[in-house]
Amino acid sequence: MEINHPDQLSVEHPTPPGDSSSLNQNGPGKQDGERCSTSGQAPEQEGSLHPEKGAHDVAEELSRQLEDIISTYGSAASPRGKESTSETKEQPPNTEAPDNEDVDYEETTEEIDREPTAPEEPAAAKEPVSNKEQKLEKKILKGLGKEANLLMQNLNKLQAPEEKLDFLFKKYTELLDEHRTEQKKLKLLLKQQAQTQREKDQLQSEHNRAVLARSKLESLCRELQRHNKTLKEETLQRAREEEEKRKEITSHFQTTLTDIQTQIEQQSERNMKLCQENTELAEKLKSIIDQYELREEHLDKIFKHRELQQKLVDAKLEEAQELMQEAEERHRREKEYLLNQAAEWKLQAKVLKEQETVLQAQLTLYSGRFEEFQSTLTKSNEVFATFKQEMDKTTKKMKKLEKDTATWKARFENCNKALLDMIEEKALRAKEYECFVMKIQRLENLCRALQEERKELYKKIREAKMSEKEDQVQRTSEEEPEPSVSENEEVDAEEANSFQKAVENLATAFTILHHPEFTPDQPTERQLAVNGPQSGSDVTHQHPETARLNHPSLPADSGSPRPPVGAQAVAEGVCEATPAPTASCTPAEAELQSQGLPAENTPGPKPHKPEANTSGQAPLSPAQGSLSVVEAKYDISPSPESEGDSAVVPGCESREQPPPEVTDIPVGPSTGLPREPDACLNGVD
């Protein structure tokens, strides 16, 4: 079992370098993929104008960062290869060292083997033969196993004790050899274990580097994704431009199609002419081949005739040899004649052979031309078939593109309609905003006018107080009535308190509260709590669009400024605090009744007309209502121009009448104002 372990370790030993190489290769693989993506984006960027040069510079910076990562983290494999080569060089001296150690170990084991041999001889001579000892031996043999059983069987077969000792000695030597070999293997395995631990440490360091490289690569990937998003936006812009180009290309493509069709017709006519010429050439070739066959038959006949002539000549020669003595002269003449004829026939044969070679060359030329013509025909047919396929594909693509253009046109028209609606809504909201701005300006002018009036009234009050004090001093010096002084002081205190309350109401009316805008998701109860019960009742009975026009306190979708809610709360609080003599109680009447003043200027209650709500006339803002209440409270004398117009409170006026403008309020001095000490005026300022 122990022998198999070194084999397994030796098999597993070379695997870690491969793993490290794979780990090292994972990083460059990703980097190559990213380079491919950047290189794939590069040709798109080359065709763009000057704004796209920045994107190209970003891609170059990312590629530089990738190269830096490769140079830092990819160079980890090179020192490892050097270490492996150095370890392989160091192995031969290490392998020689265990041999010397084994020699020393063998000497020590031989000395140990010599010592037990001496006591074994007397032990073998004094073996007991009792049953108990045999049972013990059997138990021991069972514990040792099959090898011990085999040893005992072999020993029992041997009878002489010397033979048994020799057998045991041989077995012992074999076991020693096995033990030594196992120790050698153990040392080698220990060395391999040390090497594997070193490699493991190297792999861990490389893994850490790979993790760092991976984190950097992930950051680079994120940057690339951002860059790709920008490129996508640019490509969308390009696509819009390319749609216009595509229309031009389609027109150009149609013109090219017409040209191609004309060229195809011309080529078909040329092909017909070439087919006719090919048929003519084929007929000519057939005629030439027939002539060549006739010539070959003629030559065969000539050769046969020559052979017959040669046979006759041979016969004649034999006869001439017999008659040689008789006709030597005739024989010579005939011989010369025959030699001349043979020379002539040879010349004719050479000429015929040359003609045969020439005809064969012509045949090869004609056959090659015919094959070339057939190849050109096949190529032209293939080109025509491919062209038809491409035409079919282009027609399909054109149909798809036409469908896409129709869908995009429909979307474009819908978008234009939505834009027109939005523009109209924007114009309406702008008009509303201008109206609110005008109202705010009027209120500011009114506030300034009231402040100027207040200053003048304060001056007059001070003068009146000074004159009254002087009169009182003179009267007290003359008559000195104590109860009248106390009564005057009480009246002054009551008047001061009422004036202070009026000033506080004015301050609350002109305070601008910045409330959060209401969203459609918020409940109506909160809107009613802020806008008051009157606005809530009007909104419930009216259409939402008319409610927005008639009640500016309602939240608008366009985010237009709303009037402050504090003025409404003040007016409503006054109405609730005082007992209502009639069903239609106004804030002005409530304030006047609470102070004990008659409400002469306020008109009687008028029925509420819901038809006027839809007429488009906006009611007064809460600030204007509070100002009208102040006018009614202090009986501001109107100017001669506005004597016919009575002071109207927004809660009691009819919807059909237009709201009073700022110019209707008089700026002149008023009568019947209460007396106020100077201490209350500083707080209001």
Swiss-Prot record:
Coiled-coil regions listed in the entry: 138-354, 381-470
Taxonomy, superkingdom: Eukaryota
InterPro entries: Taxilin_fam
Expression sites by tissue: Specifically expressed in skeletal muscle.
Comp. bias (Polar residues): 18-28, 612-627
GO molecular function: syntaxin binding
Positions of transmembrane segments: none
Family: Belongs to the taxilin family.
Subunit structure: Binds to the C-terminal coiled coil region of syntaxin family members STX1A, STX3A and STX4A. Has a preference for STX1A.
Name of the protein in its database record: Beta-taxilin
Origin species: Mus musculus
